[in-house]
C-alpha cells in the first residue's frame, strides 16, 4: 500500500502535546465536580453531570478506565445488569442479552468502552495516571472544596513531591471498596464527623438496592458513589452484578446537580 503521510518532527510533537495538556489542566483547575475513579459509578456520574452542563473532571489512577468492569467475573468477560439499570446501558448503546425477565448479560469490554465514550462525548474530562491523595477543606461553613493530586507514577516511585490542587464544588468518591477519598477526609478532618463502619460480606439481593438508596452526600461537598457507599455505610457487597453501580452514579449526579444549582455556586 502506498500512502503519503504528513511529516511531523519531534519538536512539534512535544510542543503540541504540552500546550494542549496544559490548557486542559488550566481550564479544569476550577471545576464544578471532581470524580475520583473511572469505574462504573464514576463514569455513570460523569455522563449525567456533564449532560447537565457541569464542568466535570474525572481522575483515574490507572492508565485505563472501567474499574472493576474489565475484570468481569473472576476474569470471565461477561457481567450481569438488572432492571432498571438496563435503561442507562441502552442510553449509551450497550447491547444486552436478556437471560430471564429483567436480567441481562453484557460484554465487559463493550460496557466500559461505551460508558466512557458517552461520558467524554457529554463533555466530561477523564485524566489517567493521577492519584487523589488528599482533599481541600474550608470552614464557615465546614466543607470539602477540592482535591490534592499527584502522578500515580510519582507515588509508585516513593518520591517526595508535593501535589497540586484542583478546586471543586463537589467531590465524588468513586474509588471502590476502600472509599479512599472519604477515608482520608474522615481521618484528617475529624470535624466532618464521618464514621466508616466498613463493607460487609456478600448479600447481592440486598446490596444492590441498599447501595443506590444510600448513595449521596457524606459531608458538605463530599459524596459517595458505587462501592464506596458500601464501605462508608456498612453495607454488603454484591459481586459481578453492576446495576447498582451505574444507578448509583446517576443518583449522585442528580443530587449534585440539584445541590449546585440550588446554591448557585457553579464555576
Curated annotation (Swiss-Prot):
Cofactors demanded by this protein: Fe(2+)
Pathway: Cofactor biosynthesis; thiamine diphosphate biosynthesis
Protein residues bound to glycine: 237
Enzyme category, top tier: transferase
EC number(s) stated in the UniProt entry for this protein: 2.4.2.59
Residues reported in the UniProt entry to bind NAD(+): 41, 60-61, 68, 132, 160-162, 227
SUPFAM superfamilies hit by this protein: FAD/NAD(P)-binding domain (SSF51905)
Disulfide bonding pattern of the chain: none
A GO molecular-function annotation: pentosyltransferase activity
GO biological process, one term: thiazole biosynthetic process
Keywords, ordered alphabetically: Iron, Metal-binding, NAD, Thiamine biosynthesis, Transferase
Subunit structure: Homooctamer; tetramer of dimers.
Function summary: Involved in the biosynthesis of the thiazole moiety of thiamine. Catalyzes the conversion of NAD and glycine to adenosine diphosphate 5-(2-hydroxyethyl)-4-methylthiazole-2-carboxylate (ADT), an adenylated thiazole intermediate, using free sulfide as a source of sulfur.
Record-stated family: Belongs to the THI4 family.
Protein name, entry field: Thiamine thiazole synthase
Organism of provenance: Saccharolobus islandicus (strain L.S.2.15 / Lassen #1) (Sulfolobus islandicus)
Amino acid at each position: 500500500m502506498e500512502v503519503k503521510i504528513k511529516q511531523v518532527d519531534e519538536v512539534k510533537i512535544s510542543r503540541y502535546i504540552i500546550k494542549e495538556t496544559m490548557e486542559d489542566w488550566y481550564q479544569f483547575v476550577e471545576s464544578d465536580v471532581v470524580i475520583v475513579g473511572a469505574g462504573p459509578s464514576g463514569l455513570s456520574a460523569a455522563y449525567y453531570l456533564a449532560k447537565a452542563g457541569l464542568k466535570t473532571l474525572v481522575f483515574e489512577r490507572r492508565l485505563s478506565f472501567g474499574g472493576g468492569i474489565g475484570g468481569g467475573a473472576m476474569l470471565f468477560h461477561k457481567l450481569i445488569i438488572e432492571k432498571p439499570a438496563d435503561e442507562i446501558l441502552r442510553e449509551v448503546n450497550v447491547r444486552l442479552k436478556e437471560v430471564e425477565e429483567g436480567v441481562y448479560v453484557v460484554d465487559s469490554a463493550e460496557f466500559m468502552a461505551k460508558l466512557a465514550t458517552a461520558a467524554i462525548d457529554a463533555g466530561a474530562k477523564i485524566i489517567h495516571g493521577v492519584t487523589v491523595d488528599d482533599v481541600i477543606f474550608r470552614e464557615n461553613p465546614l466543607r470539602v472544596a477540592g482535591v490534592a493530586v499527584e502522578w500515580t507514577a510519582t507515588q509508585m516511585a516513593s518520591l517526595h513531591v508535593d501535589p497540586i490542587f484542583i478546586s471543586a464544588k463537589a467531590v465524588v468518591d468513586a474509588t471502590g471498596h476502600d472509599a479512599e477519598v472519604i477515608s482520608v477526609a474522615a481521618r484528617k478532618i475529624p470535624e466532618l464527623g464521618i464514621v466508616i463502619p466498613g463493607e460487609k460480606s456478600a448479600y447481592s439481593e440486598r446490596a444492590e438496592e441498599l447501595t443506590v438508596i444510600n448513595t449521596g452526600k457524606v459531608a458538605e461537598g463530599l459524596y459517595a458513589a458505587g462501592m464506596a457507599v458500601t464501605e462508608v455505610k456498612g453495607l454488603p457487597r454484591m459481586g459481578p452484578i453492576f446495576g447498582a453501580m451505574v444507578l448509583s452514579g446517576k443518583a449522585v449526579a442528580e443530587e449534585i446537580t440539584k445541590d449546585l444549582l440550588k446554591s448557585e455556586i457553579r464555576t
